[in-house]
C-alpha cells in the first residue's frame, strides 16, 4: 500500500482545490518559510482523524478553514481527501483503492466519508489503527515533533514504541473494554442500587404478600367457620327462643287466670266487708231503736204511775178546777177594764213626760258648763257599768257552755275506753304471731348464712381454678400462635426451598428440571454451608457465582443451556466439574496473609462442602480472603500487591488493582446461603413448641372439666340458696304485715292515750276555766256594786256644786223631779200596764189550762179504766219490741263474727295468692327479659350475617355447614382471630405489588448476572490484552533497542546508544529513556546533547522503528532542519535506503534531502495568504539545487 493522492480545498491557506500526486520512493515538498508547505502535513494528519486544533497549530477547529485574504473572501468549508493504493489489502477493507474524506463547516458541522460513503470519525480511526499511519503514529512527524520526542518524559515517549509494537488497537480495545467495564460497572452499580432498593421492597413485600395470602386464607376459613357457627347459633337460639316463648305464653295465661282469681277474691273480700259494715250499721240502728224503745217503755211506766196518782185525786182536782175557772173568768173581766183605763192614763203621762224632758234639756244646756266634769265621770261610770253588765251575761253564757262540753267529754271518754280494750287484745294476739315469725326467720337466716359460706368457699376455689384455666388457656393460645408462626415460617422456607425462591429464573428452571436433565449437581450455594457470621462475607465473595450451576461435565451443561433456550427460561452459568480447575494462593502470599491480625481465612476454608466439589469451591473462593474489617482488608491488600480479592465480614470488598466496593448491606430475613440452616432451626423449634403445646392442651382440658364440676356445684348451691331466700322473703313478708298491724294498733293505743289525755286536760282546763269564770263573775258583781256606789257618790257630789249653779240646778232638779215623777208615774203606769197585760195573759193561760185540765180530767175520769188498759197494752208491746230488738242485735253480731272469720280466711288466701302471683310475675318478667335478650341476640346474629357477609340465615345454612363440634369451632374462630390479629395491619395490595416488584427483581437479577458475567469477561479480556500488549511491547522494544544502537552508530559514524525501561517490572506502564554516546563523548542523557545530536538521535530512533515495523508511507516535516550538512547527507541516504519499502513525503528546505528525492513539489504564496502547489521536474530541481 502507498499514498496516491492528496486533494485539498479550503484547508488553511489552500483557498483553491489542489491535488498532490504521490509516487513510490521519496517525495519532497519544498518552499520558502511561510508558504504553507507544512499545511500538507497538517492536512494529512487531519484527514487521518486528528481532533485537536492545537495539534494542527490552531486555536479551534474553525481556524483550519480558509479565513480569506485581502482579495479573497473567507470560505465556509474545509475539505481534505486522501487516496491510498490498497492492492495488498494492508488496510482491513475490501477495496483496492481507499479514499478518506473529511469536511468541516464553519457552522461546526463535520462530515466523514470512506470511498464517498458517509461514516464516523471512529470508523476512520479504526481503519488506520495499529497500521502505523494513525494521527499519533510515528509515521507522521511534524515540526517540533522531534524535539518533543527527545524532551518529553520517558512515560510519554512510550506511545511511539506502542505504535511500533502495534498495541494501539489493543490499548484502544482495552480502553474501550475499560470504558465498557466502567459502563458495565456503572450499569451494575445502578442495577445493584435498584436491586438493593428492590431488595428492601421485595423482602418486605414478600413477607407482606405472604401475610396477605395468609390473611386471605385465614379470612376465608374464618368466614366459613364463623358463618356456619353463626347459622348454628341462630338455629339453636331460635329453638330455645321458641320453647321459652311458649313457656312465657303459658305463664302469661296463668298470670291472667291468677289475676282474675285475685280480683274475684278481692271482690269477695270487699263484699264481705260491705256486709260486715252493713251489719255494724244495722246493730247501731237496732241499739238506737232499743234505746228509744226502752225510753218509751219507761215513759209508759211513768204515765201509768201518773194515771194511778191522778185517778186517786181526780174528784178533788175537778172541784178545784171548776172554782179556779170561775175566778179566772172574773179576774179576766176586771183586768180588761183596768187595762183600758190604765192605757188612757199612760198616754196622758207620756205627753207630760215629753214636755218636761224638753224643759230639762234646756236647763241642762244652761248648767252644762257648771257640771260637765261630774257628768262625764258619771256617764263614764255608767258606760263601765253597762260593759260589766255585758261581761256578766257573757260569763254566764260561757259557764253554761262549759257544763255542756264537760258532759259530752264524759260520753266520749267512755267510748274510747271500750275501743282501747279491744285494741289491747288484738295487740296481744299479734305479738304472739310475730314472735313465731321472728323465730322462723332467724332459723332460715342461719341456714342461708351456712349456704352462703359454702357458696363463697366454692366460689373462691372456682375463681382460682378459672384464673389458672384462663392463664393456661392464654398460654395455650399464645403457644398456638407461636406454633402457627413457626409452622408458617417453616412452610414458607420449605416452599421457598422447593420453589428455589430467590434464584435467577434460568437457574431456578434448571434446578427444577435437575432430575430430568441429569448431570446437575445443584447451585453453588446449595453445595456449601458456613457459620452464620461468615454468611454475608461468603455471599459477597461469591456474588452472582453463588447461583452458578455445578454439573458433572460440559455435556450436561450444554444440555441444560439447550433446555433454557428451547423454553426461553433465561440464562444461567454452569461449572462443569470435569473442566473447572481449582485456584489457590501462592504459599508466600498465604503466609503473609496468615500473619495479619485482621485475616480470618481463605473463603474456601471457611465453608463446608463435599470433597467432590473441591475444584469448584477452590476455583470460586480459593483466592478470596476474608478479614475482620475494611481497614484490615486495605492493609492486607497492600501487603499482597493488590493481587487478590478481599472481603470483610460486613461485605465490603477490596478488588484486585486496589478498587473498593462497600456501603450498607441490606440484612435479609433469610439469605439463600443461610436458608437451610434457618429451616433446620425452625423445624427444631417447631417440634419443641408442639410438644409444649400438647402438654398445655392436656392441662387446659383437665382444668376445664374441674371448672365444669365446680359450676354444677355452684348452681346447686345457688338453687338451694334461692329457695331459702324465697322462703325467708315469705316469712319476712308475714313479719312485715304483723309489724304493720302492730304498728297500727300501737298507733290506735297511742291515739287513745293522746285523746284521753287531751280530753282529761280539756276537762281540767274547763274546770279551771269554770272556777276562773265564777271568780270573774263574782269580781264583775263586786265591780258593778262599786260602780253603783260611785254613781250615787258622784250624783250627790254634783248636788253640792257652788251657789252660782244652785238656782239652775234647783230649777233643773225641780224639773227633773217633776219629770222624774212624771216618768216614775209613767213608768209606774207602764209597769202597771205591763203587769196588767201579763196578769191578763197569765189569767187567760191559766184559764185555758184549767179548762184543758178539767176537760182532760173529765175525759180521764170518764175513761180511766180504758186508758190504764191501753197503757198496759202499749207497755207490753214496747217490752216485746225491746226483746226482739235485743235478739236481733245478738243475731246480727253472730252474723258479723262469722263474716269476720270468713273475711280473715279470704284475706289470708288473698295474701298467699298475691305472694305466689308476685313470684310468678317476677319469674315471668325474668323470662320475658331473657326472651327479649334472645330476640336481640337473634336480630344481632341475623344482622351480622347480612352486614358482614351479605347472607340470609337460609343462605348461610344452605351454603355453610358446621363440620366440627361447635365448641371446637368457637375455639378455632378464636384462634383464627388471634392469628389475624397477630398479623397486624395487612396490605392486600402487596400481593400484586410483590408480583410486579418480584418480576422486576428477577429481571434485574438476570441483568445483574449478565452484567457480572460481562464484567468478568471484560476483566478477562483486559487481562488478556494486558498480556498481549506486554508481550508485543516487550518484543518490539527489544528489537528496536537492538536496531537503535546499530542505526545510531551508522548515522553518527561511531559511538553507541541505548534504550532503557524506567520500570522493567511494569511493562504496561514503564517509560522509555534514551541514552546516547556520540563519538568522542561520554554516555549521557539526551538532555545533555546538542540540538543536532538530539535531532540525529531522534532520526536514528525513527529509522530503528522503521526497521522493526515498516510502514507504507511516512511524512517527515523538516525533521533534519537542525542537522549540519554531513548529517543531512547521511539522513538523506537513509531515506533513500528505506524508500524501497516505505514511501516518504518529506517537507524540507535542505539540499541534501532534495537531492535524494524522486519527486519535488513546490509550495508558493504568490497571492498573499493563498498557497499553491506546483510540480517541479527533476532537471529543474537540480538547477535549483545548483
From Swiss-Prot:
BP term (GO), one: sister chromatid cohesion
Keyword Coiled coil belongs to the record: yes
InterPro entries: P-loop_NTPase, RecF/RecN/SMC_N, SMC, SMC_hinge, SMC_hinge_sf, SMC_prok
Pfam families: SMC_hinge, SMC_N
Disruption phenotype: Mutants produce anucleate cells and show defects in nucleoid structure and in chromosome partitioning.
SMART domains assigned to the protein according to its UniProt record, in alphabetical order: SMC_hinge
GO molecular function: ATP binding; ATP hydrolysis activity; DNA binding; identical protein binding
Source domain of life: Bacteria
One GO cellular component term: cytoplasm
SMC hinge domain sequence ranges: 519-637
Keyword terms, alphabetized: ATP-binding, Coiled coil, Cytoplasm, DNA-binding, Nucleotide-binding
Segments forming a coiled coil: 167-206, 259-481, 672-864, 893-943, 990-1029
Residues that coordinate or bind ATP: 32-39
Subcellular location: Cytoplasm
Function: Required for chromosome condensation and partitioning.
Complex and partners: Homodimer.
PANTHER family hit by this protein: STRUCTURAL MAINTENANCE OF CHROMOSOMES PROTEIN 3 (PTHR43977)
Family according to the record: Belongs to the SMC family.
Entry note about domains: Contains large globular domains required for ATP hydrolysis at each terminus and a third globular domain forming a flexible SMC hinge near the middle of the molecule. These domains are separated by coiled-coil structures.
Annotated NCBIfam families: SMC_prok_B (TIGR02168)
Name this polypeptide is given: Chromosome partition protein Smc
Species of provenance: Bacillus subtilis (strain 168)
Amino acid at each position: 500500500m502507498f499514498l496516491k493522492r492528496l486533494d485539498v480545498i479550503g484547508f488553511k491557506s489552500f483557498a483553491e482545490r489542489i491535488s498532490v500526486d504521490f509516487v513510490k520512493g521519496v517525495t519532497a515538498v519544498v518552499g520558502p518559510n511561510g508558504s504553507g508547505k507544512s499545511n500538507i502535513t497538517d492536512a494529512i494528519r487531519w484527514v487521518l482523524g486528528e481532533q485537536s486544533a492545537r495539534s494542527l497549530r490552531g486555536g479551534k477547529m474553525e481556524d483550519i478553514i480558509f479565513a480569506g485574504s485581502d482579495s479573497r473572501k473567507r470560505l465556509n468549508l474545509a475539505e481534505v481527501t486522501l487516496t491510498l493504493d490498497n492492492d495488498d489489502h494492508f488496510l482491513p477493507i475490501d477495496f483496492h483503492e481507499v479514499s478518506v474524506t473529511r469536511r468541516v463547516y464553519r457552522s461546526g458541522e463535520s462530515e466523514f466519508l470512506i470511498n464517498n460513503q458517509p461514516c464516523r470519525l471512529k470508523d476512520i480511526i479504526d481503519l488506520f489503527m495499529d497500521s502505523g499511519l494513525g494521527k499519533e503514529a510515528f509515521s507522521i512527524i511534524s515540526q517540533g515533533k522531534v524535539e518533543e520526542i527527545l524532551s518529553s518524559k520517558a512515560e510519554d515517549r512510550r506511545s511511539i514504541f506502542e505504535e511500533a509494537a502495534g498495541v494501539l488497537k489493543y490499548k484502544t480495545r482495552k480502553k474501550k473494554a475499560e470504558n465498557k467495564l466502567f459502563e458495565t460497572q456503572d450499569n451494575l452499580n445502578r442495577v445493584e442500587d435498584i436491586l438493593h432498593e428492590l431488595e428492601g421492597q421485595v423482602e418486605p413485600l414478600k413477607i407482606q404478600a405472604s401475610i396477605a395470602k395468609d390473611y386471605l386464607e385465614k379470612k376465608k376459613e374464618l368466614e366459613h367457620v364463623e358463618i356456619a357457627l353463626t347459622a348454628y347459633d341462630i338455629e339453636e337460639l331460635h329453638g330455645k327462643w321458641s320453647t321459652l316463648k311458649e313457656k312465657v305464653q303459658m305463664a302469661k295465661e296463668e298470670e291472667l287466670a291468677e289475676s282474675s282469681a285475685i280480683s274475684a277474691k278481692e271482690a269477695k273480700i270487699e263484699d264481705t266487708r260491705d256486709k260486715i259494715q252493713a251489719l255494724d250499721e244495722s246493730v247501731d240502728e237496732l241499739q238506737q231503736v232499743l234505746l228509744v224503745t226502752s225510753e218509751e217503755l219507761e215513759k209508759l211506766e211513768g204515765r201509768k204511775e201518773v194515771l194511778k196518782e191522778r185517778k186517786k185525786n181526780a174528784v178533788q182536782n175537778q172541784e178545784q178546777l171548776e172554782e179556779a175557772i170561775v175566778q179566772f173568768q172574773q179576774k179576766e173581766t176586771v183586768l180588761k177594764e183596768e187595762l183600758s183605763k190604765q192605757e188612757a192614763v199612760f198616754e196622758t203621762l207620756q205627753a207630760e213626760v215629753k214636755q218636761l224632758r224638753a224643759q230639762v234639756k234646756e236647763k241642762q244646756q244652761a248648767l252644762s258648763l257648771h257640771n260637765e266634769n261630774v257628768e262625764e265621770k258619771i256617764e263614764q261610770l255608767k258606760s263601765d257599768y253597762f260593759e260589766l253588765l255585758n261581761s256578766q251575761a257573757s260569763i254566764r253564757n260561757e259557764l253554761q257552755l262549759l257544763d255542756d262540753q264537760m258532759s259530752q267529754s264524759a260520753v266520749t271518754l267512755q267510748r274510747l275506753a271500750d275501743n282501747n280494750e279491744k285494741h289491747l287484745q288484738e295487740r296481744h294476739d299479734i305479738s304472739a304471731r310475730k314472735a313465731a315469725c321472728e323465730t322462723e326467720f332467724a332459723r332460715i337466716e342461719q341456714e342461708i348464712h351456712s349456704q352462703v359460706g359454702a357458696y363463697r368457699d366454692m366460689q373462691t376455689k372456682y375463681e382460682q381454678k378459672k384464673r389458672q384455666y384462663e392463664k393456661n388457656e392464654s398460654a395455650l393460645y399464645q403457644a398456638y400462635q407461636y406454633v402457627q408462626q413457626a409452622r408458617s415460617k417453616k412452610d414458607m422456607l420449605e416452599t421457598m426451598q422447593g420453589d428455589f425462591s430467590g434464584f435467577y429464573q434460568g437457574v431456578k428452571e434448571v434446578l427444577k428440571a435437575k432430575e430430568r436433565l441429569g448431570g446437575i449437581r445443584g447451585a453453588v450455594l446449595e453445595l456449601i454451608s458456613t457459620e452464620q457470621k461468615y454468611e454475608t462475607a461468603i455471599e459477597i465473595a461469591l456474588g452472582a457465582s453463588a447461583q452458578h450451576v455445578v454439573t458433572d461435565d460440559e455435556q450436561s451443561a450444554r444440555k441444560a443451556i439447550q433446555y433454557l433456550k428451547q423454553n426461553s427460561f433465561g440464562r444461567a452459568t454452569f461449572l462443569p466439574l470435569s473442566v473447572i480447575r481449582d485456584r489457590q494462593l501462592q504459599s508466600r502470599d498465604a503466609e503473609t496473609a496468615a500473619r495479619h491480625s485482621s485475616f480470618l481465612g481463605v473463603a474456601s476454608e471457611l465453608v463446608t462442602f463435599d470433597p467432590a466439589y473441591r475444584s469448584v469451591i477452590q476455583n470460586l473462593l480459593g483466592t478470596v480472603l476474608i478479614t475482620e474489617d475494611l481497614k484490615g482488608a486495605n492493609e492486607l491488600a497492600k501487603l499482597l500487591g493488590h493481587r487478590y480479592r478481599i472481603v470483610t465480614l460486613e461485605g465490603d470488598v477490596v478488588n484486585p488493582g486496589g478498587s473498593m466496593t462497600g456501603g450498607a448491606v441490606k440484612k435479609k430475613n433469610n439469605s439463600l446461603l443461610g436458608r437451610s440452616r434457618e429451616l433446620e432451626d425452625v423445624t427444631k423449634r417447631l417440634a419443641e413448641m408442639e410438644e409444649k403445646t400438647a402438654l398445655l392442651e392436656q392441662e387446659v382440658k383437665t382444668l376445664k372439666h374441674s371448672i365444669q364440676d365446680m359450676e354444677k356445684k355452684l348452681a346447686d348451691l345457688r338453687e338451694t340458696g334461692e329457695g331459702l331466700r324465697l322462703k325467708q322473703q315469705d316469712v319476712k313478708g308475714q313479719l312485715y304485715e304483723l309489724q304493720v298491724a302492730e304498728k297500727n294498733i300501737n298507733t290506735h293505743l297511742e291515739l287513745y292515750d293522746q285523746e284521753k289525755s287531751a280530753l282529761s286536760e280539756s276537762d281540767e282546763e274547763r274546770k279551771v276555766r269554770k272556777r276562773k269564770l265564777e271568780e270573774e263573775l263574782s269580781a264583775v258583781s263586786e265591780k258593778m256594786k262599786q260602780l253603783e256606789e260611785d254613781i250615787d257618790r258622784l250624783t250627790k257630789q254634783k248636788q253640792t256644786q257652788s251657789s252660782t249653779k244652785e238656782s239652775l240646778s234647783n230649777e233643773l232638779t225641780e224639773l227633773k223631779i217633776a219629770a222624774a215623777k212624771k216618768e216614775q208615774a209613767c213608768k209606774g203606769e207602764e209597769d202597771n200596764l205591763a203587769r196588767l197585760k201579763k196578769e191578763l195573759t197569765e189569767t187567760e193561760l191559766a184559764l185555758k189550762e184549767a179548762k184543758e185540765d178539767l176537760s182532760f180530767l173529765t175525759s180521764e175520769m170518764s175513761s180511766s179504766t180504758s186508758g190504764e188498759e191501753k197503757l198496759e197494752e202499749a207497755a207490753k208491746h214496747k217490752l216485746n219490741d225491746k226483746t226482739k230488738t235485743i235478739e236481733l242485735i245478738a243475731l246480727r253480731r253472730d252474723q258479723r263474727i262469722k263474716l269476720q272469720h270468713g273475711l280473715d280466711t279470704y284475706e289470708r288466701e288473698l295474701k298467699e295468692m298475691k305472694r305466689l302471683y308476685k313470684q310468678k310475675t317476677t319469674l315471668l318478667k325474668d323470662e320475658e327479659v331473657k326472651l327479649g335478650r334472645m330476640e336481640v341476640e337473634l336480630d344481632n346474629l341475623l344482622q351480622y350475617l347480612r352486614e358482614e357477609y351479605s347472607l340470609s340465615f337460609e343462605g348461610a345454612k344452605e351454603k355453610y355447614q358446621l363440620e366440627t363440634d361447635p365448641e371446637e369451632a368457637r375455639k378455632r374462630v378464636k384462634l383464627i382471630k388471634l392469628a389475624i390479629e397477630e398479623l397486624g395491619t395487612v396490605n392486600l395490595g402487596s400481593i400484586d405489588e410483590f408480583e410486579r416488584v418480584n418480576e422486576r427483581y428477577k429481571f434485574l437479577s438476570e441483568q445483574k448476572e449478565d452484567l457480572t458475567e460481562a464484567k468478568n469477561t471484560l476483566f478477562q479480556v483486559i487481562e488478556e490484552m494486558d498480556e498481549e500488549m506486554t508481550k508485543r511491547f516487550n518484543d518490539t522494544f527489544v528489537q528496536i533497542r537492538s536496531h537503535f544502537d546499530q542505526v545510531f552508530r551508522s548515522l553518527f559514524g561511531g559511538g553507541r546508544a541505548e534504550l532503557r525501561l524506567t520500570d522493567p517490572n511494569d511493562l504496561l506502564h514503564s517509560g522509555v529513556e534514551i541514552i546516547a554516546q556520540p563519538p568522542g563523548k561520554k554516555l549521557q542523557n539526551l538532555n545533555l546533547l546538542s540540538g543536532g545530536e538530539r535531532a540525529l538521535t531522534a532520526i536514528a530512533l525513527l529509522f530503528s522503528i522503521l526497521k522493526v515495523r515498516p510502514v507504507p508511507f511516512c511524512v517527515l516535516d523538516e525533521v533534519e532542519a537542525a542537522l549540519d550538512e554531513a548529517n543531512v547527507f547521511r539522513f538523506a541516504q537513509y531515506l533513500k535506503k528505506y524508500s524501497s519499502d516505505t514511501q516518504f513525503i518529506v517537507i524540507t528546505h535542505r539540499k541534501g534531502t532534495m537531492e535524494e528525492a524522486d519527486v519535488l513539489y513546490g509550495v508558493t504564496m504568490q497571492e498573499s495568504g493563498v498557497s499553491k502547489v506546483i510540480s517541479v521536474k527533476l532537471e529543474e530541481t537540480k538547477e535549483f539545487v545548483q
